């Protein structure tokens, strides 16, 4: 994919919607907590399943939980404890944008992720 040059919002949106998955992964970043920032020397990281996050914006502000799933196609994540109740009473996970959460605990089982964050 060619680097974005246009300032037009419609072309910015189109580029995001048409982006391949390996580019969409870059849109899944979230801020690290102050403790993690000091420990790893970086301000943000990509959210993966198993990370513990705190919701910073929206109706569920202050809620903390583990990431259940990550959807690159939708650009959203689902978190334990962030649920909406449908009219028929069933509970469904509420998708969140990763930019609205802060990572408080990293899942470090993946060796490649550990090495990329510890750079």
UniProtKB/Swiss-Prot annotation:
<keyword id="KW-0687">Ribonucleoprotein</keyword>
<comment type="similarity">
    <text>Belongs to the universal ribosomal protein uL24 family.</text>
</comment>
<keyword id="KW-0699">rRNA-binding</keyword>
<dbReference type="GO" id="GO:0019843">
    <property type="term" value="F:rRNA binding"/>
</dbReference>
<keyword id="KW-0694">RNA-binding</keyword>
<dbReference type="InterPro" id="IPR005825">
    <property type="entry name" value="Ribosomal_uL24_CS"/>
</dbReference>
<dbReference type="InterPro" id="IPR005756">
    <property type="entry name" value="Ribosomal_uL24_euk/arc"/>
</dbReference>
<dbReference type="GO" id="GO:0022625">
    <property type="term" value="C:cytosolic large ribosomal subunit"/>
</dbReference>
<comment type="function">
    <text>Located at the polypeptide exit tunnel on the outside of the subunit.</text>
</comment>
<dbReference type="GO" id="GO:0042273">
    <property type="term" value="P:ribosomal large subunit biogenesis"/>
</dbReference>
<dbReference type="InterPro" id="IPR008991">
    <property type="entry name" value="Translation_prot_SH3-like_sf"/>
</dbReference>
<keyword id="KW-0689">Ribosomal protein</keyword>
<dbReference type="GO" id="GO:0002181">
    <property type="term" value="P:cytoplasmic translation"/>
</dbReference>
<dbReference type="GO" id="GO:0003723">
    <property type="term" value="F:RNA binding"/>
</dbReference>
<dbReference type="Pfam" id="PF00467">
    <property type="entry name" value="KOW"/>
</dbReference>
<dbReference type="GO" id="GO:0003735">
    <property type="term" value="F:structural constituent of ribosome"/>
</dbReference>
<dbReference type="Pfam" id="PF16906">
    <property type="entry name" value="Ribosomal_L26"/>
</dbReference>
<protein>
    <recommendedName>
        <fullName>Large ribosomal subunit protein uL24</fullName>
    </recommendedName>
</protein>
<dbReference type="InterPro" id="IPR041988">
    <property type="entry name" value="Ribosomal_uL24_KOW"/>
</dbReference>
<dbReference type="InterPro" id="IPR005824">
    <property type="entry name" value="KOW"/>
</dbReference>
<comment type="function">
    <text>One of two assembly initiator proteins, it binds directly to the 5'-end of the 23S rRNA, where it nucleates assembly of the 50S subunit.</text>
</comment>
<dbReference type="InterPro" id="IPR014722">
    <property type="entry name" value="Rib_uL2_dom2"/>
</dbReference>
<comment type="subunit">
    <text>Part of the 50S ribosomal subunit.</text>
</comment>
């Amino acid at each position: 994919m060619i680097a974005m040059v246009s300032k037009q919002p419609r072309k910015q949106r189109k580029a995001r919607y048409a982006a391949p998955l390996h580019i969409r992964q870059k849109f899944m970043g979230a801020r690290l907590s102050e403790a993690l920032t000091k420990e790893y020397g970086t301000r943000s990281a990509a959210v993966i399943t198993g990370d513990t996050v705190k919701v910073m914006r929206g109706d569920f502000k202050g809620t903390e939980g583990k990431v259940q799933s990550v959807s690159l196609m939708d650009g959203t994540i689902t978190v334990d404890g962030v649920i909406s109740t449908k009219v028929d009473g069933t509970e469904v996970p509420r998708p969140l944008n990763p930019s609205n959460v802060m990572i408080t605990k990293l899942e470090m089982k993946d060796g490649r992720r550990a090495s990329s964050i510890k750079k």
